[in-house]
Structure formats: C-alpha cells, structure tokens
Amino acid sequence: MNVTKLNLNAPSQGDPKELQTHFIVNKNKSQYVKFPSLQDRNAVDSFHEFLCKYNVWKTTDRVILTEKSFKYEPSSCFSDISFMITFYDIFCRAKEESIKKQKEQINIVKPNNYPTGFQHVHVSQQIQHDQHPQYNKHPQNNHHPQNTQHSQNNPIDKNINESENKEDLSDRSSDSANSEESHNSQYSQDSGDSRNYQDSEDNKGNIPTGKKTEQNKLIVQRLTNPKITPDTINDSNKDSNKDLNKDLSKNQSGESIKDKSKGPSKNLSKDSSKNKSKETSGSNLPDKISEDGDDLDDLGNDIDNFMDSSDYEDSDQDAISENPSDFDEDDSDDDDSNTEILEQILEISDNEHMELSSDLLEELNKKSPSNSKKSKTNQKLSQSSKKISSKTITNSGSKSQKQEPSTFSVKLKGKVSNGKTNKKTGKNIEESDWENSQSDSDHSESSDDSDNESDNESDNESNNDSDNETDSEIDDDKNNATPNIKLIKKSKKLSPKTPMKPNNKTTSVSKPVSKPPVKSSIKNNTKNNKPVPKPIKNPKKLSKQKDQSESQSDKDIDTDSENLPVSKKPPTNKSQVPKRPVGRPPKSVSLPSSPKKPKRNIGGSKTAKTQNKSKSQPKTNGSKTSTKSIPGSKAVGKKKPTKK
C-alpha cells in the first residue's frame, strides 16, 4: 500500500484545524482522492453505508485517516473498508449543483417562451372582433379577420362571403349546421320574415332537380354579371317557395321563376335580402355550377328511370338465361347473340327516349365477334407455346449432352474458347456424338460386339479351341489396357504445360477431324490386332512373340503419342468414365486413347464375368493365344528402329 502526503496547499488565513481530518484513497496505486468533509467516525460510518449501496470500490482498497495539518504525513491509523469508495463529497456537491442548474433553467425558460408572441397577436385579433358586433354573433367566423374590410365596402361581397363560410362550416360538422340555423333565425326575426324562412326550410327536400338547377343558374349569372343584384335572386326564390307550397307537381313554376327573376325588385329591405341569400346558401348546393346543369340533371333522371324500368330487368334476365356455352362454340352464335342484345338495347332506348347512333352499333358489331376470336386464338397460341416449350426443353437437354465432349476436348487442346470450336469444327461435334451414342448405350454395344466376336470365332475355329479364344481375348484386354493408361498420363502432362502458340495450335484445333480418323483407325487396328485374315500354323512361337508384342506395343504407343497432333489427344472424355462396368480392375478403368477406335475399345464388349476371369485365372495357356497379336506386332517392330 502506498501512503503519500496531501498535495493541498496550506490555508492562507486561519488555523490548520479547519482542515483537520481528511481521507486519502489509494486506488490502483496511482489515483488519490481527498474527502475533506469527513471529520468524524460517524461520518466514516455513513460513508460506509453509502458505499455499500453502490458497490464501486474493491475490498483491497483502504481509507487513510489523517488528524494532522497538511504539512505532516498522515498517521498510521487505518480503517479497512470491505468495499470500494466512491467520490462521496464530489457526488454530494455535484448533486447540489445540478439542482441549482435545473432551477435556473426553469427561471430562464419562463420569460422567453415562444407562445408569448402568439398570445399578443391573438389578443389583437380579439380586440378587433370586439369592435365589430357582427362577428360576435358568429364566433365561428373569427378565423376570417380579413372579411371585415370587404364587408364594409361591398354589400354583395359581404353576402357572398357569409354564404360561402356557412357552406364550408355546414359540411364540416353537424354542430356548425345547428349554429347556422340559430343565427339565420335571428336575422329572420329582425327582418320580420321568419315565417317564410321556416316554410322554405320545410320545403327544401321537396324541390325538384330542375328548379335547383335554375336557382344555380341564377347564382352563376350573379357571379358572372355584376349588374344582377341579389334582390333579383331573392325575388325568384321567394316566388318559387310560394309556388312550391301550392303545387309541387307543376313544371310551369320554373318558367314563372325565370320571368319574375328578370323583372326589377325595389320594395324589399336589406334584411330580407340577407335572409333570402342565406336561404339559397342553406341548401347544400355549390355556388358555381356549369350552365349545362339542366342537361346533366335530365340525363341523371333518365338513367334512374331506366334502372327502375321493367324492360331493363327483363333484358338482364334474358341475357343471363342464355347458355354461356353458346357464346364459345362458333363465331356465328356470337353474332346472333350480339344482334339479340342490340335489339333489346334498341327497344329499351326507344321506350326511354334514348337514341343510339349508327356508328356505335357498327362498332359493337365489329368488336364483339373479334373479341371472341381473339380469345380463341390466344388459347391456341398458349397450347402451341406449351408444346414448343416442351420440345425446346428436350432439344436443349440433348444438345447439352452432345456438346459436353466437345467442350472437354477444347480444354485439353489448348484452352481455346468454346464459341470458336462450336462454330468452326462442326464435324468434330458429330464425331463426339458418335462416341457418346456408343458410350451411353452399353447394352447395344454388347450385342454388336457379340456379333463381331461370333464372326471372329468362326474364322478361328479351324485352328483354335473355345478355351484358347477366351484366353486370347483376356490377353488382348491387357495389351490394350496398359498402353491406354500411358497415353492418358502423357496427354494430361502435355496439355496444361504446352505454351499456347497463337497460329499453329489453334488451327490444329479448328481443323475438322473428319479425315484423320481413317488413318488413325488403321493404326489402331494394327495396334489392337483385330483384323486377322491369316491363321498361324506354329502355335509354339506365340509365347515369345507375345512378350515381344507387349514390349513393342508399349514403345509404339509412346512414340505415336509424341508424334500425334494435338487434335488426336483430347478424346479422353471424363463423361464416359462412370459408365464403365464396375468389376474392371483399376488399371483397365483408363479412358480411351483416341475417339477413332471402334466399338470394342470403348467398353461394352467384355462383360464383368470375363473381366473377373482376367483377375482370377492365371496364364495357363501362354503359348495358345489367338492369331490377332502377331501381324501387328511384327509390322510395328520393324518400323520402330527406323523412327528412332
């Protein structure tokens, strides 16, 4: 534990007893904290309780009590505290300061509140409204202080503004509508026309649409023509209300309203004009309506009558009762059904005084059958598209299978792009297809190879037995299997390491491979020792010749693989490897050396049974081999030393 002196300066004035007791906390051997307020043992206990609440310091830390002045070192009276000490004094002082700051912020916010500026504006508005008693009657219009200036200057604008304000408020809520009625009743009592106003409100729902449109026309004329005063409108409204009370069914009242609205009216007071302008505004009609309002209302009435008529319902039932299958069978049925529907529409239009133009009828006749034809053609197209899509799927699958060997061969030839080989070497792809067809169909190959074996056996039955033939076939497999492995290893070594020559090897890749298969097939036939035209008379020499043929055939294939062009190596197809029979030993699982070999080397000729025999049976009859291996081996043996 580190005990250090207090780093405080002595007080300038006063006794050192003022700062008599202090605590020094040694935290992490470097930080020292003072607590000048803890002067008693009771203070230490209270401090202990405080620290127990918050659990801040470790048990290894200690509290040092000093009872001397600053100039002296602290005494050795230590009290171990089993907790960690926080800055108790600093905490208390910070708490007091935070409380003071909060109080100061509250006092600062009060005089500078934002709503004070708005309150002054609002008070000024209230003073203006108090000066105008009109708006005291209408407290809802207090949010329009600009209307006061216009209303004092123009009485017409005053009435318009009042009516517009009332319509807006009536649409917002039902309370505003009730307040309008109360205020309107006050105006009507002042003018003495309250009875007419109540009658007009009772008859608002009974006004037909034609008369409403006439009233709206007058309002539009009043807005467009400044010469027309609201008195003329009020006269027409008053007379119309009287006529409606007498006879609502007569249509001549509309004409009388028009005639009376043209005449001048001079006897009505200003209060009555206000009342009548409010009557028009009370009926929730817009102020501005187009001059074609009569035509729209008449057309709406005709449509309502048409919907209510019995002919319309009968026509719907007739159209629904028809079988939907009749419309889909033939185009002639569609034409008949369309003509029937058009006749029904014409009858309905004659009854309801509606006219259809000849152009519309021609368009209906043209459109209806064409739509049915389009639907049928769309169905046919959808079916044909499904068939085509199924064909394309099968074709794409077959093409992808056929193009696999070509892409693999290109990788071995020298990393040439797939597009060039597919465009230029069309024949190369066909030959690889021939190989894939043989490798995919193992059963067909085995059947073909059985026929070839039967032919070869018929040639060899005169000199050899059936046992000798099976042994010779097994030996041929071994002779053919081991050189294939060497070819594949060398081709794998040559293909990645050979540098790309831009002109020579790409031309060798792009050349068609249709001509070389003839020569290579002749060489492969000589190597594989298949065409045996001549029988052998001395079977004793076969064992020696067999050993020579194995060694020479290995050398031949090594030198031939070096002399072959690059285009003859790639046919080692990885796609053909998993299709080999399972029982073949790992040495014979090799890939074919060239794509030009006949069917027998690709893999279906020998079954798993004969291959298992090749593992199990020893070479008992080494001398009794078939005559296939001799002529090829002799010929190759003579050629080799000259090439080397």
Swiss-Prot record:
It comes from the Viruses. Residues 292-301, 310-338, 447-476 have a biased composition (Acidic residues). Residues 159-174, 192-204, 236-249, 256-279, 544-558 have a biased composition (Basic and acidic residues). Disulfide bonds: none annotated. Residues 123-644 are annotated as: Disordered. Residues 175-191, 216-233, 607-630 have a biased composition (Polar residues). Residues 133-155, 367-400, 496-531, 585-594 have a biased composition (Low complexity). This is Uncharacterized protein R627.
